[in-house]
């Protein structure tokens, strides 16, 4: 899900009516802070770098403290790793906050679809674009293959914080299941709507604030980064507060069903879980970002929420979006830091600034679809698609199976969690297109309400709901969908030529990638969907050469294991100072030892608290 749920900073700098200004000026009401003090410690760290001095881990025994029997984990170097470039500091860092705002106002134009256009001309861009090399390396570089080294990793309590739709949650659920196989205790914290989905997979669940349906509807109404009016500002404030306020409890509160105590020793999060890095700072634990869309600056393609006139400004587009997001959330984040975490407020270009560029980051797409950019260093991994195998347990209705077998492979058409302004009109376009192209079609109702027909469903159409894509797509000749990262990945793995009908955010990015690689036609924005262009797209996808191109990629994807690579990246980026369990000095003999009551502390210190941010 694209990160666009908050008010736009430029609206503070340009003309606004008094109602909007008043709404933006209001602060979150004060509420009681969550107690982050460990049970056996009544004080907080005086170290300004962290809000707490330690966190407690799960009990471990003398012989049960390692993840695998031989006490070793073998690591393999990422196939996409290309070494570490030297650090570069922007000369922008020397400017005041007011000067930065002025530059951004001159650089940015807001588009009707809510995205930002970066104007690459004049002195402002030159100032932002100028680099100043610094001495040293950005991170530890791996001179030898990681397969030559071994590490013993203690079992950890891991909190995974995910904000978004089901498509955003699904790859993290796959990762959570794999982490559990290593002996970790994993809690997946996401919206209450997905409680049964997560628990059915055998993973501990904790609810985060925010309603994914409302978030999706907000983004569909407002497209990119800009709320359309005062009422939208109020709605997204409410969502933002609910999300941020729930992050700390998700990392320290007992399980709501079993009352089993929990305190995160490591955090995995996606960028829209705003506040993640501040919770990690307060708890003194490492954090690893994973996401399904690009969020790390690169010269090879622009930020999915930005438009730029030429490649010279690609890198700059990430800085612009980053700044705008930070200016939108800074009041809430600093209130959260002071009121809940007992941390000092921060400015954007402080040690804990507003980006994820200095955090270990894993991107959940195949390097064969979007290779790792050459300017992303060893902190960043492109791990591959993280599939959750749902199709193996799916039992379709007999009626559905008979319909599939009666004719040629159908075309799938569905828009997942995306809301539709006029479901009937969209359905009319779909039906007329299938008639025009003489194709059978499977229409997924989704959250948009497709398929509510006044008449009988035509024989060439079958309506489905909650059908696993990894079972459904292999039955299809081609797929038409909104372009969510997970849906796109599943279609490609099934060997289906793809037409993307983007609504907002990274969906346009994936539509462009599909078209560039010859895996489908040019994307059709939902507002431009018509019988003519949808019919043309279906005919394009049914060409043998397009099918052949997609099948070639599908064979490659079949041999990838993005979940394993993601878990490997998480383990590899854990702090080297991570202490291992030690025997209790108070034990008198083997028989007198307390049952699994050896505790160890994770203290990552300054070396592990990498510069991090507010997104």
Curated annotation (Swiss-Prot):
The Gene Ontology terms for molecular function here are: sterol 3-beta-glucosyltransferase activity
Q: Which reaction does it catalyse?
A: a sterol + UDP-alpha-D-glucose = a sterol 3-beta-D-glucoside + UDP + H(+)
Describe the outcome of a gene knockout: Reduced growth rates. Altered embryonic development, seed suberin accumulation, cutin formation in the seed coat and reduced seed size. Lack of flavanoid accumulation in the seed coat (transparent testa phenotype).
UniProt keyword annotations, A-Z: Glycosyltransferase, Lipid biosynthesis, Lipid metabolism, Steroid biosynthesis, Steroid metabolism, Sterol biosynthesis, Sterol metabolism, Transferase
**What EC number(s) are associated with this protein in UniProt?**
2.4.1.173
Q: What broad class of enzyme is this?
A: transferase
Q: Which GO terms describe its cellular component?
A: plant-type vacuole
Is Transferase set as a keyword in this record?
yes
- Region annotation (Disordered) ranges: 1-54
Bias (Basic and acidic residues) occurs at: 40-54
Tissues in which the protein is found: Expressed in developing seeds, seedlings, leaves and around the apical tip of cotyledons. In embryo, expressed in the seed coat and cotyledons.
Q: Give the domain of life.
A: Eukaryota
CDD domains for this protein: GT1_Gtf-like
- GO terms for biological process? carbohydrate metabolic process; flavonoid biosynthetic process; lipid glycosylation; seed coat development; seed germination; sterol biosynthetic process; sterol metabolic process
- What protein family does this chain belong to? Belongs to the glycosyltransferase 28 family.
| Functional summary from the UniProt entry | Involved in the biosynthesis of sterol glucosides. Catalyzes the synthesis of steryl glycosides (SGs) and acyl steryl glycosides (ASGs) which are the most abundant sterol derivatives in higher plants. Can act on several sterols like sitosterol, campesterol and stigmasterol. Is required for embryonic development, seed suberin accumulation, cutin formation and flavanoid accumulation in the seed coat. Both UGT80A2 and UGT80B1 are required for the normal production of SGs and ASGs in seeds.
The entry's protein name is Sterol 3-beta-glucosyltransferase UGT80B1
**Species this protein is from:** Arabidopsis thaliana
């Amino acid at each position: 899900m694209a990160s666009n749920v908050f008010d736009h900073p430029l609206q503070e700098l340009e003309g606004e009516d008094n109602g909007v200004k008043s709404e933006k000026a209001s602060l979150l009401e004060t509420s009681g802070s969550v107690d982050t003090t460990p049970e056996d410690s009544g004080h907080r760290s005086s170290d300004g770098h962290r809000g707490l001095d330690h966190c407690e881990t799960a009990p471990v025994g003398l012989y049960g403290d390692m993840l695998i029997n031989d006490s070793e984990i073998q690591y393999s170097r990422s196939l996409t790793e290309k070494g570490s470039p030297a650090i570069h500091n922007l000369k922008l860092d020397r400017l005041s906050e007011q000067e930065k705002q002025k530059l951004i106002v001159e650089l940015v134009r807001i588009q009707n679809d809510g995205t930002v256009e970066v104007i690459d001309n004049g002195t402002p861009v030159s100032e932002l674009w100028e680099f100043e090399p610094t001495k040293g390396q950005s991170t530890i570089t791996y001179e030898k293959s990681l397969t030559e080294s071994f590490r013993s990793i203690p079992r950890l309590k891991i909190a995974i914080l995910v904000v978004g739709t089901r498509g955003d949650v699904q790859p993290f659920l796959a990762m959570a299941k794999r982490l559990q196989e290593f002996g970790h205790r994993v809690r997946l914290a996401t919206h209450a709507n997905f409680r049964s989905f997560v628990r059915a997979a055998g993973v501990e669940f904790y609810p985060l604030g925010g309603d994914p349906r409302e978030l999706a509807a907000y983004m569909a109404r407002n497209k990119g980064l800009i709320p359309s009016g005062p009422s939208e500002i109020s709605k997204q404030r409410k969502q933002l507060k609910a999300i941020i306020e729930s992050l700390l409890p998700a990392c320290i509160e007992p399980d709501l069903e079993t009352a089993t105590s929990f305190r995160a020793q490591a955090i995995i999060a996606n960028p829209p879980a705003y506040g993640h890095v501040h919770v990690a700072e307060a708890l003194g634990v490492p954090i690893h970002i994973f996401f399904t869309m690009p969020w790390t600056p690169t010269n090879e393609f622009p930020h999915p929420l930005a438009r730029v006139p030429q490649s010279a400004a690609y890198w700059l587009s990430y800085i612009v979006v980053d700044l705008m997001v930070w200016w939108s959330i800074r009041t809430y984040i600093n209130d959260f830091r002071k009121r809940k975490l007992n941390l000092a407020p921060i400015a954007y270009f402080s040690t804990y600034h507003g980006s994820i560029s200095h955090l270990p980051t894993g991107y959940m797409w195949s390097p064969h679809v979007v290779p790792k950019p050459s300017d992303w260093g060893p902190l960043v991994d492109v791990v591959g698609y993280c599939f959750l195998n749902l199709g193996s347990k799916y039992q379709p209705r007999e009626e559905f199976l008979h319909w599939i077998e009666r004719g040629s492979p159908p075309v799938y058409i569905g828009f997942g969690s995306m809301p539709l302004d006029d479901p009937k009109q969209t359905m009319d376009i779909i039906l007329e297109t299938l008639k025009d192209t003489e194709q059978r079609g499977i229409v997924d109702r989704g959250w948009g309400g497709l398929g509510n027909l006044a008449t009988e469903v035509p024989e060439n159409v079958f309506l489905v709901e909650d059908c696993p894509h990894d079972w459904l797509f292999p039955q299809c000749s081609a797929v038409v969908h909104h372009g969510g990262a997970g849906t796109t990945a599943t279609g490609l793995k099934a060997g289906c030529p793809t037409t993307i009908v983007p609504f907002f955010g990274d969906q346009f990015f994936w539509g462009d990638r599909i078209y560039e690689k010859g895996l489908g036609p040019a994307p059709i924005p939902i507002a431009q969907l018509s019988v003519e262009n949808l019919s043309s797209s279906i005919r394009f996808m049914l060409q043998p050469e397009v099918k052949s191109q997609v099948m070639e990629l599908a064979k490659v994807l079949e041999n990838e294991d993005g979940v394993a690579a993601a878990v490997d990246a998480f383990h590899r980026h854990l702090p080297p100072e991570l202490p291992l369990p030690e025997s209790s000095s108070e034990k008198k003999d083997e028989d007198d030892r307390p049952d699994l009551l050896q505790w160890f502390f994770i203290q990552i210190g300054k070396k592990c608290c990498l510069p991090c941010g507010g997104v």
